[in-house]
Design a protein with these regions (language model features):
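Conserved ABC transporter NBD signature motif
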Residues: 63-74, 78-79
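ABC ATPase "signature
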Residues: 220-221
Length: 257
């Protein structure tokens, strides 16, 4: 059981890129310990920027983010020790074998007996078997994603940050990724903060959803609560209605509590 009820606190987050491009404009939300929280919104709404700030890879212009009470700007190294991050395009050392990639990545965090245990767990998680002997450059996109995810899960992060985890994957590999994430969330209590354009995936995986438009939260709640509150049959309809309400001058995010 975590001493913290909230795994992630995002408050009044602002990010302005060079040239004055505003990616985030006062974004606030909270992710509870042990839940799967999904950010959804159109391209350019600020989802990836938010995840990169949470993962300590990008500094905000204003506001703050805390992961289990740790400020990601003031204590980035401590925050990173709590986080496992899988970007949409997870890179891999193409000339390494899958096995060598697993060992190298895990050696950046562990050593000795703990390293061997983590390597063994990553191998088991991946389910890649003999394919681990092959160079990563011969892997499909789905195999690379599974390989990278297995490494992140073997690190046993308290918070797993996933940017479009199944984008571009075939049905089989997408199902494998979703199943692994849900398994580790349920069995190991890993909190998940993710983004996705796949609304069916969000409804299957997420305990709560945060809808972002123009760098601000415009709606939040469980998928069922949001659909019921907005009189919608799916999350796409929910988003469209919330966006129209926002453009029509409604103030503040719609909450389905």
């Amino acid at each position: 059981m975590s001493a913290f009820e909230n795994a992630v606190e995002v408050r009044d987050l602002v990010k302005v890129y060079s040239g004055g491009v505003v990616a985030l404009n006062g974004l606030s939300f909270t992710v509870k310990h042990g839940e799967v929280y999904a950010l959804i919104g159109p391209n350019g709404s600020g989802k990836t920027t938010t995840l990169r700030i949470v993962a300590t890879l990008l500094k905000p212009t204003g506001g703050y983010v805390r992961v289990y009470g740790v400020d990601v700007v003031k204590e980035p190294l401590k925050a990173r020790s709590l986080i496992g991050y899988l970007p949409e395009e997870a890179g891999a050392y193409r000339d390494l074998s899958g096995m060598d990639f697993v060992r190298f990545m895990l050696s950046l965090r562990f050593s000795g007996r703990r390293l061997e245990e983590a390597v063994g767990e990553a191998i088991e998680i991946s389910g890649l078997g003999e394919d681990l002997k092959r160079p990563v450059r011969t892997y499909s996109k789905g195999m690379k994603r599974i390989l990278a995810l297995s490494v992140v899960l073997a690190m046993k992060p308290r918070l797993l940050v996933l940017d479009e985890p199944t984008a571009g994957l075939d049905v089989e590999k997408a199902l494998q990724v979703r199943s692994l994430v849900k398994k580790y969330n349920r069995e190991h209590g890993i909190t998940v903060l993710m983004s996705s354009h796949n609304m069916l995936e969000v409804e299957y995986m997420a305990d709560r959803v945060g809808m972002i438009y123009a760098g601000r939260l415009i709606g939040e709640g469980t998928p069922e609560e949001l659909k019921r509150k907005l009189g919608a049959s799916n999350l796409e309809e929910v988003f469209v209605k919330l966006k129209e309400a926002t453009l029509g001058g409604a103030s503040g995010p719609a909450s389905a509590r």
